[in-house]
Swiss-Prot record:
Its cofactor is Fe(2+); L-ascorbate. Keywords: Dioxygenase, Iron, Metal-binding, Oxidoreductase, Vitamin C. This is PKHD-type hydroxylase ABSDF3031. 2-oxoglutarate binds at R169.
Amino acid sequence: MIHHIPNVLSKEQVAEFRKLMEEANWVGGKVTAGTLSASVKRNQQLSEQDPLTHHLSDIVIKAIWQNPLFQAAALPHKIIPPLFNRYDEHESFGFHVDNSIRLIRGTAEQIRTDLSCTLFLSEPDEYEGGDLVIEDTYGYHEVKLPAGDVVLYPSTSLHEVSSITAGTRFASFFWVQSLVRDDSKRHLLFSLDESIRELRKSHGDSYSEVMKLTNIYHNLIRMWSEL
């Protein structure tokens, strides 16, 4: 399932990110690509060793751990520290699938990539082209969100960033190992969580059905989660 998570960063935070990123030193994006995806990857990245990458990454990590909608949709167990890229005119990243296992930066720890995430750092009207195109069983989905918003989607999906025809597209990208690896189970849990939240709004926390559904939700987490 594809999730749109709005306002992960404020407009003020985005503006500060952009100021720092526009003054940064960029390297070729193929440094983090697998052998197959490197052949279709034409973009630029901040180096993983750049102190700016660490600084911005810490801000993004804090924001997503504190975002209730992200937590409900992803059920994160581990998060790869975010990286940052830019696409200038004629740059793109053709259809590819993300690596199933990745190292956490600066450690020997590996994580399974269950969910892929893009945090948009350019407004849609700042560039032409550059859509994130995600393929799933229902077809192709073109995604271009406001700056500060995140799209979250299964890492099993083929996806691309279409060619930039004008302007520059800045973004952050990262991966999540979920407590629940199966996308269909995560979707069921998210739908149940949404129903519980709506019942709490309309009937209050002491409503008996809220208690029953919350019990079911947590028991399903116990049944399906991996730690």
